[in-house]
């Protein structure tokens, strides 16, 4: 791959906010509207095609939760788009995560947030973080999410440095079930699978979160071609700007598992003490160099084979989530009673939760 040939039109940092006023997305009643999506202080609703032009107003009675029901406990995450607070329901005492995103941002980012709300509204899976309700008020979107008290897999990895194979298999099995649901039931490519987007809790659950850059396809064989997501975990076909499918998420999963097993990101910079000069250098390495592999002298043949099945350079050669669930690396531990809950809690309190927006 020639220097400078890498997706020349890509913008690797957010452009300054555009001139489109937020009022473009608001109805006369102050409801945030994007196509079939309506969000106001009373909740969120997806309207039918016949209602898009003249949708009815969301009523408070449509939803069981409202922002006034929650009391802020502390800030547990910050990002460019806003903050995440730990909140407690005043009447039940239950804890939730409240993600608050200011909407005075560029139009494309508002579109991403609207897409995230649609996916949150329609997804119901034990391996995907639950979104209970969303609101729009005072220029901000607020999303009530399931609180995962173990933080993210990235937080956990900072504490334990590496994760043994048997625990990785149990973690991976849950992630694969979540990906199977997204890919085959909802036709969604996550497009930003990474350790910080996998959340854990004290009972051993592992759940996928953050659908801000996800794509919804028309079918299980559909393709996308938009360049979004975290560059480190991006598949070669996505970096090259070509069409890609659900197996781009499988590439990302392979890198995540290899990082968890070895304790380091699979692609090392030429000068280890200096890091990558820029993101283009990293992406050119991902495209030009052979795919990373698990050192056979450190890991089982089953794990090495699993990683290889995930990080094939040609997406057609990668196994699907469903196929990977039958891989020996996953099935070899089926008879063992692997207590992820105890393993997660043994490392102590989480460093943070939902640290990226």
Swiss-Prot record:
Entry GO MF terms: ATP binding; MAP kinase kinase activity; protein serine/threonine kinase activity
GO BP terms in the entry: defense response; response to other organism
First-tier enzyme category under EC:
transferase
Under which EC number(s) is this enzyme classified? Answer: 2.7.12.2
Q: Where is the signal peptide?
A: none
Tell me where on the tree of life, at the top rank, the source sits: Eukaryota
Which reactions does this protein catalyse? L-tyrosyl-[protein] + ATP = O-phospho-L-tyrosyl-[protein] + ADP + H(+); L-seryl-[protein] + ATP = O-phospho-L-seryl-[protein] + ADP + H(+); L-threonyl-[protein] + ATP = O-phospho-L-threonyl-[protein] + ADP + H(+)
- Oligomeric and partner information: Interacts with SIPK.
Family membership noted in the UniProt record: Belongs to the protein kinase superfamily. STE Ser/Thr protein kinase family. MAP kinase kinase subfamily.
What name goes with this protein? Mitogen-activated protein kinase kinase SIPKK
């Amino acid at each position: 791959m020639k220097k400078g040939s890498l997706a020349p039109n890509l913008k690797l940092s957010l452009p300054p906010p555009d001139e489109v006023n937020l009022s473009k997305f608001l109805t006369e009643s102050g409801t945030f509207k994007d196509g079939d999506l309506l969000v106001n202080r009373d909740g969120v609703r997806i309207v039918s095609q016949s209602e898009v032009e003249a949708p009815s107003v969301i009523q408070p009675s449509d939803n069981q939760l409202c922002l006034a029901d929650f009391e802020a406990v502390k800030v547990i995450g910050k990002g460019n788009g806003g903050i995440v607070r730990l909140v407690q329901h005043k009447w039940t005492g239950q804890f939730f995560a409240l993600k608050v995103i200011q909407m005075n941002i560029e139009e494309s980012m508002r579109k991403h947030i609207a897409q995230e709300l649609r996916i949150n509204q329609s997804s119901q899976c034990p391996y995907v973080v639950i979104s209970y309700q969303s609101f729009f008020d005072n220029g901000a979107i607020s999303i009530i999410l399931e609180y995962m008290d173990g933080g993210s897999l990235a937080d956990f990895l900072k504490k334990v440095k590496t994760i043994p194979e048997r625990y990785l298999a149990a973690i991976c099995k849950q992630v694969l079930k979540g990906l199977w649901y997204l890919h085959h039931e909802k036709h969604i490519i996550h497009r930003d699978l990474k350790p910080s987007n996998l959340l854990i809790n004290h009972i051993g659950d592992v759940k996928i979160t953050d659908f801000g850059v996800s794509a919804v396809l028309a079918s299980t064989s559909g393709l996308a071609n938009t360049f979004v997501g975290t560059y480190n975990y991006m598949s070669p076909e996505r970096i090259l700007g070509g069409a890609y499918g659900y197996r781009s998420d499988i590439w990302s999963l392979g890198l995540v598992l290899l990082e968890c097993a070895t304790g380091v990101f699979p692609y090392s910079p030429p000068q280890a003490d200096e890091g990558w000069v820029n993101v283009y250098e990293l992406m050119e390495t991902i495209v030009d160099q052979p795919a990373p592999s698990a050192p056979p002298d450190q890991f089982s043949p089953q794990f090495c084979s699993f990683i290889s099945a995930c990080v094939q350079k040609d997406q057609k050669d990668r196994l699907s989530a469903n196929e990977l669930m039958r891989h020996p690396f996953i099935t070899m531990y089926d008879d063992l009673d692997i207590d992820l809950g105890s393993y997660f809690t043994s490392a102590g309190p989480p460093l943070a939760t939902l640290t990226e927006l």
